[in-house]
Amino acid sequence: MASQVQPGQKPKVQPCRYKTGKTLGAGLYSVVKECVHIDTGQYYAAKVINKRLMVGREHMVRNEIAILKQVSTGHQNILTLVDYFETMNNLYLVTDLALGGELFDRICRKGSYYESDAADLVRAILSAVAYLHDHGIVHRDLKPENLLFRTPEDNADLLIADFGLSRIMDEEQLHVLTTTCGTPGYMAPEIFDKSGHGKPVDIWAIGLITYFMLCGYTPFDRETNLEEVQAIATANFSFTPVEYWRGVSQEARDFIKRCLTVNPKKRMTAHQALQHPWINPPYDTTDDLGSGEDLLPNIKKNFNARRTLHKAIDTVRAINKLRENGGLMMDGIMSVDPKPEHVNGSEVVEDRTTPRERENEDAMEIDSRSNARGQTEQQIREQERKVKETVAGLWSRTAPRSER
């Protein structure tokens, strides 16, 4: 049973009632672990948030608790909050255990994947978003990583998770939110120009997710951040390369276009989207959508290349965070600096570069926008090689200089 907390009031500090197990996922400020209630033996997922790393951001956690308390038991496609409390060092959000994995990991493990499968998944997302909007809640951070399956079964519920950036708002306050929030590639145009935003930002994100679900890459990938923002601001996208979209129906493309409408007032609402012919066809279109073409081969190729790069990006961000916090502190123990390494062909070998030479190397940067759109197999292998080389050299750049 969750601790009773009034709005704006901190959870009571108390001993942890759960024993944590294997790690299910991790971010910059938190880690999600499997846990078991010490008294009942029931298994859950615990989002463990380091209070020291969240200094100045505590409101995000309080907000997530408030949102989940209000909606988590009212819809089958929203993750259920079971408990919340804090210990001396951590904040805990305990939810039902979603064992089915993330959306795209699950898709890539399937033997086949058709447009009708995508429509079914988007319908479930829309149903949950319509429920949130009916309760005056804007999620503001919808993306594939925040969509989890309840169980590994084929008919498992798809769940919306991570309400840290969500907001509760009255109907007359529909467009008063002005803070920049969310994941840049999934932000709506009105978030960037800070003209005020509300429920339509979730529909924009659903359009992006749908596009991604049909090809394995995102529509606004550009060479620079500025070009990406400009493309989002004008909804400058296309259904290309043609070979990845040849098997996708016009109904699906129209649905995406109506979600990715620049003017939020002209964008579909969640309830309107649920009535779109692609989501709610007038007849059984299972055999018609995309002419029954299996979309999985192209999606796996594009998504796996994108995932390889983003794993490296997450590593860079995590290590940069460790730098900010004064060294390689892991679970309260100073990590021993491993031998520096680099990639020679396909082998990781000891790096004999001197500390002075390493100091003069260029700063490490990885472009987070790349998503392998339309890459050849050779280009993908080259990208993976570069990522491996970058990750292998990370540790040699993170140890305090006094230790080198």
UniProtKB/Swiss-Prot annotation:
Modification comment: Phosphorylated by cmkC on Thr-179.
Residue segments, region Calmodulin-binding: 301-323
Region (Disordered): 336-404
Keyword Cytoplasm attached: no
InterPro entries for this protein: Kinase-like_dom_sf (IPR011009), Prot_kinase_dom (IPR000719), Protein_kinase_ATP_BS (IPR017441), Ser/Thr_kinase_AS (IPR008271)
Ranges of compositional bias, category Basic and acidic residues: 338-370, 379-389
Record bears the keyword Transmembrane: no
Assigned keywords, A-Z: Allosteric enzyme, ATP-binding, Calmodulin-binding, Cell cycle, Cell division, Kinase, Nucleotide-binding, Phosphoprotein, Serine/threonine-protein kinase, Transferase
Catalytic activity: L-seryl-[protein] + ATP = O-phospho-L-seryl-[protein] + ADP + H(+); L-threonyl-[protein] + ATP = O-phospho-L-threonyl-[protein] + ADP + H(+)
GO biological process: one example: cell division
Disruption phenotype: Lethal.
Domain of life: Eukaryota
Name this polypeptide is given: Calcium/calmodulin-dependent protein kinase cmkB
The encoding gene: cmkB
